[in-house]
Amino acid sequence: MTILRKSHPLLKIINHSLIDLPTPSNISSWWNFGSLLGICLMIQIITGLFLAMHYTSDTTTAFSSVTHICRDVNYGWLIRYIHANGASMFFICLFIHVGRGIYYGXXMLNETWNIGIILFLTTMATAFVGYVLPWGQMSFWGATVITNLLSAIPYVGTTLVEWIWGGFSVDKATLTRFFTFHFILPFIITALVLVHLLFLHETGSNNPSGLNSNADKIPFHPYYTIKDLLGIFMLLLALMTLVLFFPDILGDPDNYIPANPLNTPAHIKPEWYFLFAYAILRSIPNKLGGVLALLLSILILAAFPLLNTSKQHGLMYRPITQTLYWIFIANLFILTWIGGQPVEHPFIMIGQISSILYFTIIVILMPMASMIENNVLKLHV
């Protein structure tokens, strides 16, 4: 008689995805971040549901409802801070996951990579609309500035912005629809995650060597379930340390001031995980140019499979491209720092140089380095 998990129509799917899944025997801890993202998504949905039970999406009561959650709801402060800092952990895992994909050549699994980019954009949209909900100063002005960028679109821009706002400024209608989007998007993300995994399991996982690993695979359970559990415990330790000791370290103090349309904060800036894109946006003096650069800073990921000129899979044995990769990562940190700085000398110049370098490395230097490496290694196959 067949084991139930192998014959039952529903359990069979779970079995093929999480238990008997053939997995390369040599994948490192960089492969843990996929499962960590799954855990982050679960944490965010659960805490988000509990917050939604007490939150009111009305401009007059939104700020007080968040205060009420923190002061009067049992462990409301804990749920709120897990949700706020959980978003930061989510993006840390997301950046590492994408970075690992670039380093080990996972971009060549086209469908998985493209769904991943859609997931990245959807997660960014979710985080943006979520940041507006507490209706503090930075929530209000962040929403105003970022939605206003759409007015740079020729001909339809202004109409589009007013349509998104539901009026002539960010107001009650905007907050209500943003709450709706913030509620529904995580479930859309969950559906996209399943599609992401479906495509991944069609081809099988990549591995650090970049070679075909079909000859040496092991079952996912118990080997990688145990390995993932260690990662999950470390993630929870980091998250709870952040929540219980430094809950506001990644937030903005201005968001503890209720939204006031008549008073603009000194420095309007988004959450830390958007700062790199915000720095690229600000580095271009033209409004439409800035918006296009902002979009391209994320959509350039879709060009990775097209720009790949190497005969090898991944950067494991490619020292020139490896050096460029780490310069690119360092440059991302610089952009993140610049995004949080005021618009003045020397930050403007540093931001512009970093933005140029960001695109130059991806579009010109990495493909050139790959071609040089092919020639040096005589890879003309």
Swiss-Prot record:
Its cofactor is heme b. GO terms for cellular component: mitochondrial inner membrane; respiratory chain complex III. Heme b b566 binds at H97, H196. The chain crosses the membrane at residues 33-53, 77-98, 113-133, 178-198, 226-246, 288-308, 320-340, 347-367. GO terms for biological process: mitochondrial electron transport, ubiquinol to cytochrome c. It is found in: Mitochondrion inner membrane. InterPro entries: Cyt_b/b6_C, Cyt_b/b6_C_sf, Cyt_b/b6_N, Cytb/b6-like_sf, Cytochrome_b, Cytochrome_b_C_euk/bac, Cytochrome_b_N_euk/bac, Di-haem_cyt_TM. PROSITE patterns: CYTB_CTER, CYTB_NTER. Keywords: Electron transport, Heme, Iron, Membrane, Metal-binding, Mitochondrion, Mitochondrion inner membrane, Respiratory chain, Transmembrane, Transmembrane helix, Transport, Ubiquinone. Binds 2 heme b groups non-covalently. This is Cytochrome b. It comes from Scolomys juruaense. The lineage of its organism: Eukaryota, Metazoa, Chordata, Craniata, Vertebrata.
